[in-house]
Amino acid sequence: MMYSPICLTQDEFHPFIEALLPHVRAIAYTWFNLQARKRKYFKKHEKRMSKDEERAVKDELLSEKPEIKQKWASRLLAKLRKDIRQEYREDFVLTVTGKKHPCCVLSNPDQKGKIRRIDCLRQADKVWRLDLVMVILFKGIPLESTDGERLMKSPHCTNPALCVQPHHITVSVKELDLFLAYYVQEQDSGQSGSPSHNDPAKNPPGYLEDSFVKSGVFNVSELVRVSRTPITQGTGVNFPIGEIPSQPYYHDMNSGVNLQRSLSSPPSSKRPKTISIDENMEPSPTGDFYPSPNSPAAGSRTWHERDQDMSSPTTMKKPEKPLFSSTSPQDSSPRLSTFPQHHHPGIPGVAHSVISTRTPPPPSPLPFPTQAILPPAPSSYFSHPTIRYPPHLNPQDTLKNYVPSYDPSSPQTSQSWYLG
């Protein structure tokens, strides 16, 4: 799936997100935001939204830019990644993408040992159970935050209390739901002029006309459409739902990362913002480079080693070359490994490139750790807004080449040191 890199900053880009984003349903963004708007309106005005106001909010959310929806989904996926136990993250991705038979995926419990509740929006006071979030995200079922009791776990689930595997979660349908489904079906057939509606035996009784009031602003066809459409639909190249390519990183865990990026929009010049959905949000990897299949270390590193390595702090460094640049055989570097350019039909200039290995930065001459004063190193996908290297300076040179050494025995050095 191709999408613009401007919608995913370095803090929101991770192979976990890269693989799961095409499987998020488009209704998730509209549904979570609509519920939050309704709750905020009720707390402010102490009354519920009118039908016209709610319908206007729904239309506004449905017409939102795809880049905004993807940015929201990437943040939520990053949060879910932290809430899933580390040893189950690989199984979660492989089962959701259909590369492995569904198995239990356990989440980190709350302080009481129960399933956690998270807020799905920034600065939102409405919380959702993790299993509810999974059903809405990957199945597109519009559940309320109070519908936790309607969820049932599969008989194959070994830990129903903490399992968040979407394939193990089902929604219980009661008699009232069946009755309403029949009533709505008869109403739709009557409006469409179906011949069966002319049969008096199949017509709903007249007293049912006044027994139900539709409180939602979605109709049936609209719900079905947005629940089946992936959230990545409408950006870059639109793939049919059944032809969405899977992520090669999770197809073969020993083959490294094949990062697919689109060059339709230029890299962002703004400094990427850190995910701040809530206070306990773990920082995403910054400045880390994903191994290439051509790298000797790629085949020997497991999922857990990559996960731990990408969560470790790094120091500020500047790559020798930009990621997307035409390189000649003379200036090839062992750090940079470029995949064969597989051009997509109709999109010229789209290539796949990753940085193969990560070289440790040179030792700093400063007497104190640089991690305490310097922000995390930005990814090579984006330019840094404050640090600039003059053309005559070599980024690999350390600070000792430009800072005069201090010698207490030398009077000139001592005098210049205090006067400077």
Swiss-Prot record:
Post-translational modification Phosphoserine, affected residues: 264, 292, 295, 312, 328, 333
Main location: nucleus
PROSITE patterns recorded: CTF_NFI_1, CTF_NFI_2
Gene Ontology cellular-component annotations: cerebellar mossy fiber; nucleus
Domain notes: The 9aaTAD motif is a transactivation domain present in a large number of yeast and animal transcription factors.
Record's protein name: Nuclear factor 1 B-type
Source organism (scientific name): Bos taurus (Bovine)
GO biological process, one term: DNA replication
Family: Belongs to the CTF/NF-I family.
Chain ranges for the short sequence motif 9aaTAD as given in the UniProt record: 397-405
